[in-house]
Amino acid sequence: MATLDVNPQRYQQQLAEKVQRLTDMFAPYQAPELEVFESPDQHYRMRAEFRVWHEGEEMYYIMFNQETREKYRVDQFPAASRLINDLMPLLIDAMKDNESLRRKLFQVDFLSTLSGEILVSLLYHRQLDDAWIENAKALKQRLNDEGFNLNLIGRARKMKIVLDRDYVVEKLDVNGKPYTYQQVENSFTQPNGKVAEKMLEWAVDCTQESQGDLLELYCGNGNFSLALAQNFERVLATELAKPSVESAQYNIAANKIENVQIIRMSAEEFTEAMEGKREFRRLKDNGIDLKSYNCNTIFVDPPRSGMDVDTCKMVQGYERILYISCNPETLKENLDILSETHHITRFALFDQFPYTHHMEAGVMLERKA
């Protein structure tokens, strides 16, 4: 993780700079007034990773200055959730005098939740043995006795030892309704829990009074699919990463939602299927007849690289396009194509990453008359 100057007194200033930047970037598209969704000014990040430095009997977390690459000690990390900050010193203190737990430990990853669960991954430059397992179990018990709802993972080359489970269960509040999400270690999850709730509420608001079905590309663990399902008859969602698809299925069942279907495909493959260029057995095996869907709305939340040209062309076939972007530069490139046929009716900034140059944006597009 990079150097981060978390200064609550600077929060509004850095947000205003982002608002100006995003507004200027999208002025050519006649975007409506920007809706701005703030982050907490500290303790907003649900996950954090630290390297571990050994110095004689001492052991502590370090990070690296992005510009100088110099290491510096980290005892607290204001960007991270209070849960992570509470656990950081207790974890290191519990391990530093234990040879089995500290030997060749080089990294600690934290994944926390608004629901109070936390998952810790300990990464080693050595193979882990039975002694490690016994000591790790004792460590987990000790921290749980101190009030943490904690699970533990040990990792080494080609090795993963899970003490109980390798995921947390998050609960996000969307307009007063709680949604349950399984978040698996090393899988993508929204890093800023409070802003994630605001993104879901905005997406639900944008799609009120929708008709027909929803098609969603890049659905991840079903983060948006579940909340948006209330506004549509059916949701058909695609995702390529197998762990995310498995989490999405878990989340559909956990939330007792019956009108969402997830299929494991890339956006590019789905485009080929929609255009009839290829037949995919997995569609048939899952009983999915694409022709039976009546999708007027498509939702996309692509990776930083945005959508390729063919996917953009396919997306243009829908009356309404809801697009969440973690990279406004590639959103802009995609809009050069999408704006030929659609215009922006809603425009939002979500401050997922305070005190950095990164911006998360949302646009709602509707077909031009």
UniProtKB/Swiss-Prot annotation:
It catalyses: uridine(54) in tRNA + S-adenosyl-L-methionine = 5-methyluridine(54) in tRNA + S-adenosyl-L-homocysteine + H(+); uridine(341) in tmRNA + S-adenosyl-L-methionine = 5-methyluridine(341) in tmRNA + S-adenosyl-L-homocysteine + H(+). S-adenosyl-L-methionine binds at residues 190, 218, 223, 239, 301. GO terms for biological process: tRNA methylation. The keyword Heme does not apply. Keywords: Methyltransferase, S-adenosyl-L-methionine, Transferase, tRNA processing. GO terms for cellular component: cytosol. The active site is at 326 (nucleophile), 360 (proton acceptor). Disulfide bonds: none annotated. It is an enzyme of class 2 (transferase). Belongs to the class I-like SAM-binding methyltransferase superfamily. RNA M5U methyltransferase family. TrmA subfamily. This is tRNA/tmRNA (uracil-C(5))-methyltransferase. It comes from Vibrio vulnificus (strain CMCP6). The lineage of its organism: Bacteria, Pseudomonadati, Pseudomonadota, Gammaproteobacteria, Vibrionales.
